[in-house]
Amino acid sequence: MKKLFNLLKKGSKSSLIAAIVNFLLGSLKFLAYLFTGNVAMFAEMMHSFGDAANQLFVWVGSAVSRKAPNEKFPFGYGRLVNIVCLFAVIIVAILAYETILEGIHHIQHPSNADQNFNHFLINAGVLLIGIIMETFVLYKAGKEVLEEAHLPTTGLHPLTTSFANMNKAKPATKLVFLEDTVATSGGVIALIAIIISRLTGFGQIEGIVSVIIGLMMFYVVARVFLENAAGAIGVSDDEMELKASRIILENQYISDIKRLIVVKEGVDLHLEAIVETPHHDYSLRQLAEIKKDIATRLLQEPHVVDVNIEFMEEDTTQDWVDGKGSSIYKPYDTKGV
């Protein structure tokens, strides 16, 4: 039990916080929906419970993915977090569908605008509490995004610059950030809809907002699914590949890179390179020293956990060009050292 607890502590903190907050908000919105029957509140309730469920899955998955490699899984459990995220978005997709369906039904068969002032206060109050709490979670997730991107996290940066650096975050952090962006904006839209419905009597707006929130949820589903499907298969990291190539070519004993691949395993990066040396008379000891020097520098980079380097004799052809992407499909002569 202690071993399991220590493992769970390694999980994404933003996912755990988001799961707890969304469960509390979902329960609050459920009570508000029972009292008022408001459709926009129903959409928000479904969204909160969906977020709570999949963020709980993501928290557990991100923790288990940190397990050390073993004989059965020599490359570790890194891709497990991608698989968990794929499972999580299925839940979001189902809830998004139900939200849109309920919204369309309300548009086609609008009920009379609720003139009960107490109901209005309940709905507005619950949504306002939700916006405040979701903004707090969004701020925490944005801060985690910036920490993983090695950027300043002070002031309003988590709510501003985090959007531009979202792709540098871990899959679990990115999922929480995206979902809470939708949750916060959805809460604002739902609050506006309830106010408009109260002031104008236009009850259909609640159904329209329900559809909008459902479509926003589907956007999260599509984006998270595509990114994590690529991660589960094994996607290259072009930014790290470019950085690694410059580190390798800074070594005075390396003249060219024949092949370089950086593959993501969850948050971990595995690097494989075939490099050219200008002379063929290096001893095994010298090659081992060169390899050790390059590998040591590469392993200092964030998330790089494994480096494999092979040597070839220089072939007088310049193969590596910065920014050309992974060289995995480039043909190369197999005569190596």
Locations of the language-model features?
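Alpha-helical transmembrane segments and their helix-start/interface "positive-inside/aromatic belt" motifs
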Residues: F35-M45, G76-F87
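Aspartate-rich (DDxxD/NDxxD/DxxxD) Mg2+/diphosphate-binding motifs
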Residues: S62-R79, H109-A113
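Alpha-helical transmembrane segments of integral membrane proteins, especially early/N-terminal helices
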Residues: L7-I17, M45-F57, I83-T99
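Topogenic membrane-insertion module of multi-pass membrane proteins
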Residues: M1-L28
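Alpha-helical transmembrane segments and adjacent TM-loop junctions that form the membrane-embedded core
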Residues: V81-V337
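Cytosolic juxtamembrane amphipathic/interface segments immediately preceding
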Residues: K2-N6, K10, K72-L80, M166-A172
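Acidic (Asp/Glu-rich) catalytic motifs at the cytosolic membrane interface
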Residues: V21, F30, L34-K67, I104, ...
